[in-house]
Regions:
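Alpha-helical protein-protein interaction modules
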Residues: 1-145
Length: 145
């Protein structure tokens, strides 16, 4: 049996290979499996990294779907939005779990080309705005109860 970390690596590589072959549907399956990996012995940081990597795969899948000439235009548009919205949702989930408390992770995300397909989306812009606002706010002091 493989460890959850090994499974995560394999799912990420499989998703990337599927994208290289323009198979966005299979890449999305890998991304969803990656996002859903859970293990009681894994650190939450690893699980958050899985969700971040899944968001990257979904973002890239949205770009691949946009170029899929075999799909009708309406279906193509719907898939692009579905994949991209799911990618943003995973990033928001990661933020709520504390993944972006590390400024290095925020800096990486801001320049990560895997997320370029999301950058013009309103929900992604809102996510960035909220992330930057929370980064400038000091942690709330503990209450004296």
């Amino acid at each position: 049996t493989q460890s959850p970390a090994e499974a995560a690596k394999l799912l990420l590589v499989r998703g990337q290979v599927k994208l290289d072959r323009n198979d966005h549907l299979a890449a999305v399956e890998s991304a969803e499996e990656l996002a859903g990996l859970k293990s009681s012995d894994e650190q939450s940081d690893t699980l958050q990294a899985n969700a971040y990597n899944a968001a990257c795969l979904l973002s890239l899948a949205s770009a691949a779907a946009a170029k899929d000439e075999e799909l009708a235009e309406a279906e193509r548009t719907a898939l692009v939005d579905k994949y991209a919205a799911r990618a943003v949702a995973l990033l928001i989930e990661d933020r709520s779990l504390g993944y972006f408390k590390d400024p290095a992770k925020v800096a990486h995300m801001k320049k990560d080309t895997d997320l370029d397909p999301l950058r013009e989306r309103d929900d992604f812009k809102q996510f960035l705005k909220e992330l930057e606002a929370s980064a400038t706010q000091p942690d709330e002091p503990a209450s004296d109860e």
